[in-house]
Amino acid sequence: MLKEIKWKVNNLPKGDKENCIKFLNEEEITKVRNFHKSFPQYKETPLANLEGLAKKLGVAGVYVKDESYRFGLNAFKVLGGSYSMGRYLAQRLDTDISELGYDKLTSKEIKEKLGEITFFTATDGNHGRG
């Protein structure tokens, strides 16, 4: 049983948008979200409410994302791989990924344009790098 809870204070400046990583802007985040929402298997990740921990910490709530439901693969890592493949296919089709949802990507027309393509993904552990 957990006897001690440790935390690290985040001393990074708040609201310093100018120094954020540029590819993580609102427009790109929206593209990523919309791309994944176009998949029929997509479901929002449920949150587990850790009421006991919240009470012990004296806070209103503590929630943890349950990634075991992510596309039936038990991990969040699929998101980076699928989006990377989507962007590659968009590049091959000379279009923006925001124009390519699941239905279009899996259409006969797109399959004929792209031909046979094989993807391989791998990870180097629990770091989410593919």
Task: Please state what every model-predicted region is.
Residues 1-130:
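PLP-dependent amino-acid enzyme catalytic core
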